[in-house]
């Protein structure tokens, strides 16, 4: 189920005049102070939809939205309640066209993951643009480390989608959790909840020990008919950022991506295809001791080089990344806390072959 992407004409709308110069003011600053410093940040997109998830000071997971303009991010945009200082991960399936007898609606399937107060995994789910419900993951009481970060992906499939979550256990190993969705479970939630469909959530691969509190990033992409590749990134006890690769058959060691990163570095990753038939390009974002966010890149995974992105962030800032584009045009979006309105989440964009600031701070700013 290949992710749909923006075209260059739609990309331009990400830079309206109001996004490039954002006025402050007491109301804006008060609203932004409700965003937790060092909040987990997660981002998903499809076609012209973008969603950003962060945590407020009361533990709520809030959703900010971009659909040609920014909205959301307020208290009434809370989709779940998490443990304080919870990591946040999100995954989205393709944009789908749903037709009812009375209307036609565009739906984006989204899953958002977080830690509950007892350090078990929680899930908020949406199969439309407005309706959220508690996902089935909450029933499994999967215990993870109190310092665990999270990553999540919808694995592309021509038959049915598969969900994967990556977390750190109490013994500091990195664990994969998975859910293979049956066709029946793709019905509207009101029907799916009454049907026992799919194989349920399961523990899958374990990648061994990692640095306690490491960031975790994951991405996935199609590599051919009914085949996909998943890549997972985390930090080892010697502070290297390493890669694990699943080639639709088994996991392998992808080697070292970053030789030395900030302990418990934030991590984000995204991928894109510059030219059909060429290897997939991958970008990984990580933190340094002096609180900069840097970029590593590879084309096909043969070697890693230093990317162009470099920007300072607040000491505990996390990072999220998405890509909109293909066929020679790619437009990466990064989300970090870089001090805008103190706690605001800022957007940085690779657009027309250079990095530039997108919106100074996403809603509630």
UniProtKB/Swiss-Prot annotation:
Binding site for beta-L-fucose 2: 111, 123, 201
Binding sites annotated in the UniProt record for beta-L-fucose 3: 164, 176
Localization per record: Secreted
Name recorded for this polypeptide: Fucose-specific lectin
Annotated binding of beta-L-fucose 6, by residue: 70, 333, 347
Native source organism of the sequence: Arthroderma benhamiae (strain ATCC MYA-4681 / CBS 112371) (Trichophyton mentagrophytes)
Keyword set, alphabetical order: Glycoprotein, Lectin, Repeat, Secreted, Signal
GO annotations of cellular component type: extracellular region
Quaternary data: Homodimer.
Binding annotation for beta-L-fucose 1: 51, 63, 132
Database matches in Pfam families: Fungal_lectin
Its job: Probable L-fucose-binding lectin.
Xref: SUPFAM superfamilies: Fucose-specific lectin (SSF89372)
Glycan attachment sites: 26, 76, 85, 118, 248
Keyword check for Cell cycle: no
UniProt-annotated stretches for the region 6 X approximate tandem repeats: 22-365
Protein residues bound to beta-L-fucose 4: 231
Major location category of this protein: secreted
Region forming the signal peptide: 1-21
Recorded family membership: Belongs to the fungal fucose-specific lectin family.
Keyword Heme: no
Recorded GO MF terms: carbohydrate binding
Sequence repeats: 22-79, 80-141, 142-206, 207-261, 262-309, 310-365
Positions of beta-L-fucose 5 binding: 283
């Amino acid at each position: 189920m290949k992710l749909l992407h923006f075209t260059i004409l739609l990309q331009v709308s990400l830079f309206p005049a109001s996004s490039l110069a954002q006025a402050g003011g007491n109301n804006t600053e008060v609203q932004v102070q409700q965003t937790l410093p060092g909040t987990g940040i997660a981002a998903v997109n499809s076609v012209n939809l973008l969603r950003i998830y962060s945590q407020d000071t009361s533990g709520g997971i809030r959703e900010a939205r971009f659909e040609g303009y920014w909205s959301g991010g307020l208290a009434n945009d809370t989709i779940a309640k998490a443990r304080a200082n919870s990591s946040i991960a999100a995954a989205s399936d393709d944009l789908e066209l749903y037709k009812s007898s009375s209307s036609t609606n565009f739906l984006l399937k989204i899953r958002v993951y977080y830690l509950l107060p007892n350090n078990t995994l929680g899930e908020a789910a949406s199969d439309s643009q407005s309706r959220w419900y508690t996902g089935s993951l909450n029933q499994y009481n999967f215990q993870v480390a109190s310092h665990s970060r999270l990553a999540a992906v919808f694995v592309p499939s021509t038959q049915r989608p598969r969900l994967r979550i990556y977390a750190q256990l109490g013994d500091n190993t990195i664990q994969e959790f998975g859910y293979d969705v049956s066709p029946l479970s793709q019905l509207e939630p009101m029907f799916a909840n009454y049907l026992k469909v799919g194989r349920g959530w399961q523990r899958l691969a374990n990648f061994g020990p990692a640095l306690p509190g490491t960031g975790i990033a994951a991405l996935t992409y199609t590599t051919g008919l009914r085949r996909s590749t998943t890549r997972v990134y985390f930090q080892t006890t010697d502070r290297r950022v390493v890669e694990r690769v699943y080639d639709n058959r088994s996991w392998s060691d992808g080697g070292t991506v970053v030789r030395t990163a900030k302990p418990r570095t934030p991590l984000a990753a995204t991928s894109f295809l510059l030219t059909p038939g060429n290897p997939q390009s991958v970008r990984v974002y990580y933190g340094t001791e002096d609180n900069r966010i840097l970029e590593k890149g590879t084309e096909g995974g043969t070697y890693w080089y230093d990317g162009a992105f470099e920007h300072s962030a607040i000491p505990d800032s996390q990072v999220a990344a998405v890509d909109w584009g293909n066929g020679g045009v790619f437009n990466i979006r990064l989300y970090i806390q870089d001090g805008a309105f103190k706690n605001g989440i800022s957007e940085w964009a690779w657009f027309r072959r250079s990095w530039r600031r997108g919106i100074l701070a996403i809603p509630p700013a």
